[in-house]
């Protein structure tokens, strides 16, 4: 490339690297252009005016001509340096990297003159600042170039200088100080770079050279570990102000330190000023530095003497500043408070889930194996889990209270070398790295601190009595040992957006609410937000840990949240007063809209209801209940497909049990049968969680608006405690007890549901509702014929009877008082397993009372006496049946014997109560006296049951009429359960044998009286119509003869279904072999089933 190739048409040189192929021109910035060498210009590249305001704005050069440029702040709102300096001082000439072909010899001569003679004051060269990395004056390295005697104290750099250049530099300095411009010469023009005076503040530029120097301790007896600590402490501005204001210099260790260091600094500055004012520079002799060393060593020896008993350190042995610095701070508690900060270690193992949170207060924290993205606000590092020993788990330090001076120790160093990256804002203050202690591999420590002009001073006790100035901190990232942050003045966060200004996981200082859980904080209704995990002791609201909140919030259904609410509320609601539970009314229901999630909303409601503080003891819980009924609180927290009433109804039951408040249920327009079934299926799956609860969420009745669920609960609380305990113990029985069915009821209903093909239409219409309500259950495990009678079975039967009468009552009638009988239309279509769960979970001793007699409670003795009377009747009936069984065996053994058909009666006067007017058909097996005796016993038993119900207050609602079919079914279930197997019917015609169990028993031809009586009674009482058939005469002897050789016929599918419902395979095999074990019973007993 020739000189002409760098010129344009008018003879002016080109700007930039050139126009050769492969060389691209630099982008332009604005219309003035951009200096191509801007990266070498500034020390830190930031505007000092913006940095004083907490902002980091870069200074960028703008070209104003082909040879000159000016540095301006990139912030559009900042005009620095315009107005602070004269325009002539702001303009920088072209760098020497850009050649000027027309003036090569002139610039070379100018550089020669700079070495051998002082420059003219008004020369353009004086308006520039030529520096190199090893320049002694600009970089603040006072390496002994003032005089020959002083250079002896700096052996590290004086060898690179010659006496001629040193003297020339002193002459240049004197001339430039008169013009307030600092100029330095260099020996290597190839590495010269242009630096504007705008980098330094005006105060620093105007100060004499001596004020840019700092004295330091010299290394003796391997005390670099102590020298680096003292050098870092004396340059901390916050510490210096505190010590000078509050400490006595005679008694305080740190006061003595600052006093002696200030004395040594004054010695250096005073002698240097004398040399500047014209005195001989030889005044600065080694004697002055000997005096400086004496001051510094004296205070160092005093501090070492105080540390020696605690550190067990000796002269000549190496120590670590990590241990010595905290011990030194403990000597003065008021000084230690400037370094002490509080934080918490948060750890959670991703492998085993082990977690802990430790709060600590320290002045120096050690980090090892830090994450690559480490930052003071993301202070995380890798460590093992103490529980499972899993490696590479993350532990994080969360600052809670930061001190004015923050120190951290890094074993492996920092990930990045740029210390500006680690500046941060905390509680509205800017924290900036001002000191760094470097650790070298040869067990040597060096202190670096940030000066006011933005440069860094290196305090190495092996490099002379004065610190060396550097443009940037030249500490490698891996050798960064201890980092010290200092808190600057309060800076508005919006003005320092370039730095991380938000503190994660801490409470905001301004008092603004920043809740981590919107549902919980909005429902709490308080001004305090929920603290983070790092503050367990200052939590507002519930003392509930994070795993517990997650366990509630991550439920698998809406029902789980509702049941969790019952689990948490019910024990406290039964024991606390209404004032304590009524404080929930202060909940602001509209805030629940913050999080429209079905599970989280109900979980938040659980926490609010369980842990609401007692703010207003005199308030009532009705306001909350009313808001629940209106759907303001629950509906937004539940999914839109789920009706708000489903949860609010359960809440009303809970609140009404806690405080005697009758709560009206809300009216729902349309039923939701599918959702009720889903709730019941979920309740079946979560049976282990709800067995101990008398409240069941299955019993939601969206179709009966007037049914109050509060009155019965209130009545339950007034009952005797013994009955309550007995009722709950009965509920806690194993589930297989509740799942078993009475064998006759199950068998008959299975017959009616399966054998509809040959049944009359009237029977089908009547049995349809019964089969829907009580479907059949297959399996021998459900046969409880050999179970011992107990009070729980009788109470279950009574509750089943009350439920059946409730079902048959009109929908628009007055509501019953008990919430246990509230079965919806959707529940009627549910499966049989769900209905059995519903029956099994109902409290056993609950009784129905009339509305006018709510306060009256029947004594326990009356109910027990009535039940004993019924039990005696049953025992007597069993004796009759056993006697009938024996006669049946005799009848089979003598088939030619004609049974007597005469009618005898046996009065039933066991209890002195008149028999009912309802007539029962006469049986046609055995003797007529036995049949009538059994008939009377059945009537008496039914009457005693009804009488016992009426005396004990167990009457149904006024609108509910009694239904004998249900009671007959249960009576037969109790009567026939002790028998070995089944009792086949004895009707003469096969078409009439709807309930026939087998053909092994002899059958009689019914007389005309018996047939007419049977049909008449059935038609009158139950509108029962048997199929019409022709009258046939059958020979009684032939029937009796053929009855002996008949066996069970299992060929019919109807009979197969019947036996499948009732017998197991082994039972059927035994029936075919032994006919005497099959007793006989009258098929007319099943007329009402």
Swiss-Prot record:
Q: Where does the UniProt annotation locate this protein?
A: Nucleus, Cajal body
Point to the regions of Basic and acidic residues compositional bias: 895-907
Q: Which residues form the active site?
A: 224 (nucleophile), 444 (proton acceptor)
Regions of biased composition (Basic residues) lie at 791-803
Can you tell which superkingdom this protein's organism belongs to? Answer: Eukaryota
Protein name, per record = SUMO-specific isopeptidase USPL1
- Oligomeric and partner information: Interacts with ELL.
Primary role: SUMO-specific isopeptidase involved in protein desumoylation. Specifically binds SUMO proteins with a higher affinity for SUMO2 and SUMO3 which it cleaves more efficiently. Also able to process full-length SUMO proteins to their mature forms. Plays a key role in RNA polymerase-II-mediated snRNA transcription in the Cajal bodies. Is a component of complexes that can bind to U snRNA genes.
Modified residue annotations for Phosphoserine: 894
Q: Which GO terms describe its biological process?
A: blastocyst formation; Cajal body organization; cell population proliferation; protein desumoylation; proteolysis
Q: Which is one Gene Ontology cellular component term of this protein?
A: Cajal body
Chief location: nucleus
The opening ranks of the lineage are: Eukaryota, Metazoa, Chordata, Craniata, Vertebrata
Write the record's keywords in alphabetical order, separated by commas. Answer: Hydrolase, Nucleus, Phosphoprotein, Protease, Thiol protease
Keyword match Oxidoreductase? no
Q: Quick one: where's region Disordered?
A: 90-128, 687-739, 791-817, 835-868, 891-928
Domain USP: from-to ranges: 215-488
């Amino acid at each position: 490339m020739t000189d002409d190739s760098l010129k344009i048409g008018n003879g002016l040189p080109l700007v930039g690297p050139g126009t050769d192929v492969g060389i691209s021109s630099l982008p332009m910035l604005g219309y003035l252009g951009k200096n191509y060498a801007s990266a070498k210009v500034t020390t830190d590249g930031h505007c000092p005016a913006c940095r004083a305001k907490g902002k980091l704005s870069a200074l960028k050069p703008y070209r104003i001509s082909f040879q000159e440029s000016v540095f301006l702040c990139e912030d559009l709102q900042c005009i620095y340096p315009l107005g602070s300096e004269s325009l002539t001082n702001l303009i920088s000439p072209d760098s020497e990297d850009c050649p000027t072909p027309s003036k090569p010899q002139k610039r070379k001569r100018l550089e020669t003159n700079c070495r051998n003679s002082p420059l003219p004051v008004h020369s353009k060269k004086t308006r520039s600042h030529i520096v190199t990395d090893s320049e002694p004056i600009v970089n603040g390295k006072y390496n002994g170039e003032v005089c020959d005697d002083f250079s002896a104290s700096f052996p590290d750099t004086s060898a690179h200088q010659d006496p001629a250049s040193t003297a020339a530099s002193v002459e240049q300095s004197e001339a430039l100080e008169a013009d307030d411009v600092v100029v330095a010469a260099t020996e290597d023009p190839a590495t010269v770079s242009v630096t504007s005076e705008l980098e330094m503040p005006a105060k620093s530029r105007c100060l004499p050279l001596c004020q840019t120097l700092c004295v330091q301790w010299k290394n003796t007896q391997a005390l670099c570990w102590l020298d680096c600590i003292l050098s870092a402490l004396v340059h901390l501005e916050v510490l210096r102000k505190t010590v000078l204001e509050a400490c006595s210099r005679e008694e305080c260790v740190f006061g003595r330190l600052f006093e002696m260091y200030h004395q040594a600094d004054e010695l250096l500055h005073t002698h240097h000023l004398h040399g500047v004012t014209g005195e001989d520079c030889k005044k600065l002799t080694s004697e002055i530095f000997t005096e400086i060393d004496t001051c510094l060593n004296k205070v160092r020896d005093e501090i070492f003497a105080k540390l020696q008993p605690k550190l067990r350190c000796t002269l000549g042995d190496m120590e670590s500043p990590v241990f010595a610095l905290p011990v030194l701070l403990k000597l003065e508690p008021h000084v230690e408070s400037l370094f002490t900060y509080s934080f918490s270690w948060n750890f959670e193992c991703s492998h085993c889930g082990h977690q802990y949170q430790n709060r600590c207060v320290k002045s120096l924290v050690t980090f090892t194996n830090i994450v690559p993205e480490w930052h003071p606000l993301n202070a995380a590092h890798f460590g093992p889990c103490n529980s499972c020993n899993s490696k590479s788990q993350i532990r994080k330090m969360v600052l809670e209270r930061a001190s004015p001076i923050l120190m951290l120790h890094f074993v492996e160093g920092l990930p990045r070398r740029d210390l500006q990256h680690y500046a941060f804002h905390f509680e509205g203050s800017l924290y900036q790295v001002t000191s760094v202690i470097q650790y070298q591999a040869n067990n040597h420590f060096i202190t670096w601190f940030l000066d006011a002009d933005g440069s860094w001073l290196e305090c190495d006790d092996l490099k002379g009595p004065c610190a060396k100035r550097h443009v940037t901190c030249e500490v490698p990232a891996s050798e960064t040992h201890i980092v010290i942050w200092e808190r600057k003045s309060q800076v508005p966060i919006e003005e320092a957006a370039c730095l991380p200004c938000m503190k994660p996981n801490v409470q905001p200082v301004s008092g603004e609410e920043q809740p981590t859980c919107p549902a919980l904080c909005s429902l709490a209704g308080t001004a305090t937000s929920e603290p983070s995990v790092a503050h367990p002791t200052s939590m507002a609201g519930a003392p509930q840990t994070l795993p517990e909140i997650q366990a509630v919030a991550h439920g698998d259904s809406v029902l789980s949240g509702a049941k969790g609410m019952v689990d948490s509320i019910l024990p406290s609601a039964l024991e606390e007063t209404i004032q304590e539970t009524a404080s929930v009314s202060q909940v602001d229901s509209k805030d629940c809209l913050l999080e429209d999630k079905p599970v989280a909303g109900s979980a938040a409601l659980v926490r609010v209801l369980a842990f609401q503080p007692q703010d207003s003891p005199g308030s009532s819980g009705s306001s909350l209940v009313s808001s629940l009924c209106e759907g303001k609180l629950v509906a937004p927290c539940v999914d839109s497909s789920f009706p708000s009433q489903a949860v609010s109804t359960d809440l009303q039951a809970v609140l009404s049990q806690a405080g005697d408040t009758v709560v009206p249920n809300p009216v729902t327009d349309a039923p939701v049968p599918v959702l009720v079934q889903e709730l019941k299926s979920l309740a079946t799956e979560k049976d282990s969680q709800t067995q101990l609860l008398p409240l069941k969420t299955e019993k939601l009745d969206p179709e009966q608006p007037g049914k109050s669920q509060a009155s019965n609960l209130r009545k339950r609380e007034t009952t005797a405690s013994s009955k309550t305990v007995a009722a709950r113990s009965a509920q806690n029985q194993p589930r297989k007890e509740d799942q078993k069915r009475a064998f006759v009821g199950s068998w008959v209903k299975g017959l009616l549901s399966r054998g509809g093909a040959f049944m009359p239409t009237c029977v089908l219409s009547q049995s349809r509702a019964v089969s829907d309500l009580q479907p059949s259950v297959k399996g021998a495990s459900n046969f409880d014929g050999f179970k011992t009678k107990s009070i729980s079975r009788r109470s279950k039967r009574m509750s089943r009877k009350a439920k059946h009468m409730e079902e048959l009552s009109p929908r628009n009638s007055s509501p019953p008082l008990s919430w246990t009988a509230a079965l919806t239309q959707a529940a009627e279509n549910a499966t049989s397993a769900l209905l059995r769960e519903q029956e099994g979970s109902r409290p056993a001793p609950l009784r129905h009372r009339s509305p006018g007699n709510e306060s009256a409670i029947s004594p326990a003795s009356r109910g027990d006496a009535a039940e004993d009377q019924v039990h005696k009747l049953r025992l007597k009936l069993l004796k009759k049946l056993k006697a009938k069984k024996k006669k049946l065996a005799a009848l089979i053994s003598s088939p030619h014997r004609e049974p007597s058909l005469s009618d005898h009666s046996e009065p039933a006067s066991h209890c002195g109560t008149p028999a009912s007017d309802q007539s029962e058909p006469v049986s046609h097996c055995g003797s007529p006296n036995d049949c009538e005796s059994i008939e009377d016993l059945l009537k008496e038993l039914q009457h005693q049951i009804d009488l016992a119900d009426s005396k004990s207050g167990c009457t149904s609602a006024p609108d509910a009429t009694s239904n004998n079919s249900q009671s007959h079914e249960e009576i037969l279930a109790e009567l026939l359960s002790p028998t070995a197997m089944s009792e086949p019917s004895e009707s003469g015609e096969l078409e009439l044998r709807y309930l026939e169990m087998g053909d092994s028993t002899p059958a009689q031809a019914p007389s005309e009286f018996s047939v007419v009586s049977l049909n008449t009674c059935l038609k009158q009482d139950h509108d029962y119509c048997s199929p019409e058939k022709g009258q046939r005469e059958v020979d009684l002897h032939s029937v009796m003869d053929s009855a002996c050789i008949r066996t069970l016929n299992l060929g019919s599918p109807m009979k197969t279904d019947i036996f499948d419902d009732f017998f197991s395979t082994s039972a059927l095999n035994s029936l075919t072999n032994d006919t005497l074990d099959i007793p006989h019973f009258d098929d007319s007993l099943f007329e009402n089933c």
